[in-house]
Amino acid sequence: MSRRLSRGKEDHVKRTLCLGVLLAALVGATVWATGTVPTGDVVLTISGPMILMNRWDAAAGAGVCDFDMDMLKAVPVTTYTVTDPWLGEKTYTGVRLSDLLKWIAVDQYAVKVVIVCSDAAEFVIQIKDAAQYPIMIAYASNSKVIKAGSGGPLKVVYPYQIEGVEALYGPDNWAWYVVGIRVEY
């Protein structure tokens, strides 16, 4: 004896299945849109209002974008020499903060990022300043990987060779042991 669903229940099941398929497609498209997910150790996690993400953070109730070092190096590279207030003249290589924010398609109304370090220190950078100046998330110093014992693998470098940058972001804003970036309105 076969039981048939009533017309209303049948429509409900169809709508639920369609919604499930649509949701799965959207989640899959979001992960695909970043191009990849980390295969190595995660060195940077970006959270906040953005389009591209590759992981759902259940605790935060939001998507995030995790980067391993290879993924970070896929973002356009920048290099410049600057007088590091703590280490003297260095040539740093990394990614411009503005390029990284474009890469993950940060919401156009976001106004700042909070750089989060492994020791829980936090530093605020205005997005308009990141767009105007080549503020860098560096992974190499003088062509060598920045090791954990030297503040790595990531640190924030400010282009002090440009007039006015040091007045905006003094020496205490140079962040070592960077592990996260939180985008905020």
Each model region followed by its residue ranges:
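Short, Lys/Arg-enriched N-terminal segments with co-localized hydrophobic residues
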Residues: 2-12
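Bacterial N-terminal signal peptides that target proteins for export
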Residues: 11-19
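Bacterial N-terminal signal peptides
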Residues: 20-28
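Ubiquitous "structural anchor" signal
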Residues: 4-6, 28, 33, 102
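N-terminal intrinsically disordered, low-complexity segments enriched in P/E/S/T
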Residues: 33-185
